[in-house]
Swiss-Prot record:
This is UDP-N-acetylglucosamine--N-acetylmuramyl-(pentapeptide) pyrophosphoryl-undecaprenol N-acetylglucosamine transferase. Pathway: Cell wall biogenesis; peptidoglycan biosynthesis. Gene3D superfamilies: Glycogen Phosphorylase B (3.40.50.2000). It is an enzyme of class 2 (transferase). It catalyses: di-trans,octa-cis-undecaprenyl diphospho-N-acetyl-alpha-D-muramoyl-L-alanyl-D-glutamyl-meso-2,6-diaminopimeloyl-D-alanyl-D-alanine + UDP-N-acetyl-alpha-D-glucosamine = di-trans,octa-cis-undecaprenyl diphospho-[N-acetyl-alpha-D-glucosaminyl-(1->4)]-N-acetyl-alpha-D-muramoyl-L-alanyl-D-glutamyl-meso-2,6-diaminopimeloyl-D-alanyl-D-alanine + UDP + H(+).
Length: 374
């Protein structure tokens, strides 16, 4: 069967789509895949490296922009709709799968016009605008948290399934992770990461907090993002021999496996990964995201006792150091958080979603062939 996948702009939309794509090929060995994105989104570099055919459309955002930018974005989206219809006509998919981002809007609308079944995978507790608008057309919408249900229109078929993560996240061993990072089993390891691009204020307060920590055997792996590596390195200076500073980590499965605790933003993919790893963490949601969706994500874990959540506004290094000290030294707290994370984790999410998609696509193809046979 043929599966057309769309979603992009950020890794939070792309990597779940790739996990679903991999699961589809496992369950349908004859699967043909086409990924539709933009030339300027990160998907243009990431998807071809995954060995998936990639097609391009025009698209543009219209949310939280000025009037002129919204008009330009709308015109690009209209052109993208026509281009998406062309891709659908040529590829003839049995189903279209959207994971969000403004690129998905024209493709999902084209699927609706072409009468191709579509499904949506939402990553956040507060759904993105593209997925909320397209949900009415969808055969199914997969949501990772029950809290997301309230934000979709009545009558939408919502299916609870976690955010897909790479199998390597769950399978990486603690021993291999520590070996890769030059850490011993006796070390108490804290991993800090503010997202793939880093974050200035997050990195600044995190580094100052680390310098205030007094935890026996502490080792810190601080992933700054390329942009802020120099600033954070200067901030630590020669005061932090126990800190391993990295601009980017290409081996995140091993990094997670090596950790005893984490300090992160609250992007959907990061939260799915710490759930699968059952990694007790302090979360500082980014205040610079649409609809404040990272705080919605973080609070869903906090309510379940699965994370400590701190707001960035007004956060002092001393406050953060106190929270991290508690996380690193209170074993009873860490055990409760690991248990709570295990309850919300869904390591089989990609396979669950793919199985449903294959079933819907098969029904669609059979119905189409039955109509032709009349």
């Amino acid at each position: 069967m043929r599966y057309l996948i769309t979603g992009g702009g950020t890794g939070g939309h792309i990597y779940p789509a790739l996990s679903i794509a991999r699961a589809l090929t496992e369950q349908d060995p004859e699967a043909e895949l086409l990924y539709v994105g933009t030339r300027t989104g990160r998907e243009a570099a990431i998807v071809p490296q995954a060995g998936i055919a990639f097609a391009v459309i025009s698209s543009g955002g219209v949310v939280n922009l000025g009037l002129l930018q919204r008009v330009r974005g709308g015109l690009r989206a209209a052109r993208g709709l026509l281009e998406a219809l062309g891709h659908i006509r040529r590829f003839r998919p049995d189903i279209v799968i959207g994971t969000g981002g403004f690129v998905a809007g024209p493709v999902l609308a084209a699927a609706r016009l072409a009468r191709v079944p579509l499904v949506i995978q939402e990553q956040n507790a507060f759904p993105g605008v593209t997925n909320r608008l397209a949900a009415r057309w969808a055969t199914a919408v997969f949501v990772p948290y029950e809290e997301a249900r309230a934000h979709f229109p009545p009558g939408v078929r919502l299916i609870r399934a976690g955010n897909p993560v790479r199998p390597e996240i769950a399978s990486a061993s603690r021993e291999a992770g520590r070996q890769a990072l030059g850490l011993s089993e006796r070390d108490r390891v804290l991993v800090i990461m503010g997202g793939s691009g880093g974050a200035r204020d997050f990195n600044r307060v995190a580094a100052e907090a680390v310098l205030q920590l007094d935890v026996p055997g502490l080792r810190v792996v601080h992933i700054t993002g390329e942009r802020y590596f120099g600033q954070v390195k200067a901030q630590y200076g020669d005061r932090a021999p126990h800190v391993t500073l990295l601009p980017y980590a290409h081996n995140m499965p091993e990094v997670y496996a090596a950790a005893d605790a984490g300090l992160f933003r609250a992007g959907a993919l990061t939260l799915a990964e710490i759930q699968v790893r059952r990694l007790p963490s302090v979360l500082i949601p980014s205040p610079n995201v649409t609809h404040n969706h990272q705080e919605w994500n973080a609070r869903t874990l906090e309510r379940r006792g699965a994370a400590i959540v701190l707001r960035e506004g007004g956060l002092t290094p001393a406050d953060l150091a106190a929270a991290l000290t508690r996380l690193l030294t209170d074993e009873a707290l860490a055990d409760r958080m690991r248990a709570a994370l295990g309850e919300v984790a869904d390591p089989d999410a990609a396979r669950t979603i793919a199985r449903r998609i294959v079933g819907i696509a098969r029904q669609s193809r059979e119905a189409r062939e039955a109509r032709r046979g009349r």
